[in-house]
A protein has these predicted regions:
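Short amphipathic beta-strand/extended segments with alternating polar/hydrophobic composition
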Residues: 114-119, 310-317, 324
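Short acidic, glycine/serine/threonine-rich loops at helix termini
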Residues: 270, 296-297, 325-326
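Ferredoxin-reductase
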Residues: 55-152
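FNR/FR-type flavoprotein reductase catalytic core
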Residues: 137-292
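Short Fe-S-cluster ligation motifs
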Residues: 6, 54-74, 314-330
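Local cysteine-cluster metal-coordination motifs and their immediate loop/turn environment
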Residues: 17-20, 24-41, 287-320
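Short, surface-exposed secondary-structure boundary micro-motifs
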Residues: 107, 156-157, 306
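OB/S1-fold single-stranded nucleic-acid-binding modules
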Residues: 2-4, 8-62
Length: 330
């Protein structure tokens, strides 16, 4: 019998059980999905049902909002904003992991916060850096933030990257990181983790639609010199990118490819690897699903799959291939 391997990013953490478990919609626990038997989808060393019972059948306290002082604001170009702010030490530690993100707002209205991936979290200085692409109403509001002023953030959240298990298990291996556009920002914590585990990392960057590679400051600290090239051409993986990927995985025995960009880039890379018959290479990628509450309640991050399955991707940790296979568009 086929059993899908999925995980909940919050399972076993201080935020579990959450509102989903309280309402009978737990991602992992069968009994907290309405069943009368114990059949967890993925055992994490903690019984979520028991934790809920011990907590009076109520969800644990969820993420808090913090008011933080902005230490630096840089407008890299008209639509790219870099913000550095001071955070509590525990929050800085929690946000140092690959895939970490927060919700930011500059307005008192809680409906105006926007999910932003962490570029860097310095646990020595407690300075957190984020890079924001100005696209719509919510992100335009962030242009009003000034150095020395304050911003309100909510976090920590950790499901900004799919395939985290594939990243963590890499040790003394050769890794390829492919990034495009604002995907340059969330790739930095991933590269940092890979370098810490003594992996050799090759980075390909397509700066489009930006004017420059604005994460050079952090790549230099990691002794990473990225190769710049055009990755997408007419909505498809460019011939230049195909040649580079085929050459690098052929000569360097690549064990993991991390894709930091839009879903079209992830999909095209997976399709090309299938064409090369290289399903043996592990994958990880950015989580590009829309998010609003970050707790799986609002439904903004949900997607429907074959078999009438609904997945809440602000919490569901899956492999990059799984987020496209069997996905329904209506």
């Amino acid at each position: 019998m086929f059993k899908e391997t999925i995980d909940c990013i919050d399972a076993g953490t201080e935020y579990c059980p959450c509102r989903l478990a309280e309402s009978g919609e737990c991602i992992l626990c069968s009994q907290l999905q309405g069943s009368h038997f114990c059949d967890c989808l993925n055992w994490n060393g903690v019984c979520i049902y028991q934790e809920l019972y011990n907590n009076g059948n109520k969800a644990k306290e969820q993420r808090k909002a913090y008011t933080c002082k902005v230490s630096e604001k840089v407008l890299c170009q008209d639509d790219v904003l870099l913000i550095k702010f001071e955070a509590p030490h525990k929050l800085a530690i929690d946000l140092a992991k690959p895939g970490s993100f927060i919700f930011i707002r500059s307005d008192e209205n809680v409906y105006f916060d926007v999910p932003i991936s962490i570029l860097d979290s310095n646990i020595d200085t407690n300075i957190i850096s984020v890079m924001i692409e100005i696209r719509g109403v919510k992100t335009k509001q962030l242009l009003n933030i000034e150095s020395g002023g304050e911003i309100t953030i909510r976090g920590p959240y950790w499901n900004g990257v799919f395939g985290l298990k594939n990243i963590r298990k890499q040790k003394n291996n050769n890794i390829l990181v492919i990034a495009r556009g604002i995907g340059m920002a969330p790739m930095v914590p991933v590269i940092k983790k890979l370098v810490q585990n003594d992996n050799k990392v090759t980075v390909i960057v397509d700066k489009q639609p930006f004017n420059d590679v604005y994460v050079s400051e952090w790549l230099d600290k990691l002794n990473i010199v990225p190769q710049e090239m055009n990755l997408i051409e007419k909505g498809k993986l460019s011939p230049e990118a195909k040649v580079a990927i085929k050459s690098i995985i052929g000569y360097n025995n690549i064990s993991l490819i991390h894709i930091a960009g839009a879903d079209i880039l992830t999909y095209d890379v997976i399709e090309y690897l299938d064409y090369l018959d290289r399903q043996d290479i592990d994958l990880s990628c950015c989580n590009n699903f829309k998010m609003c509450c970050g707790e799986g309640v609002c439904g903004a991050c949900t997607a429907r799959f074959s078999g009438h399955r609904v997945k809440r991707f602000c919490k569901v940790q899956a492999s990059p291939r799984a987020i496209f296979e069997g996905r329904r568009l209506i």
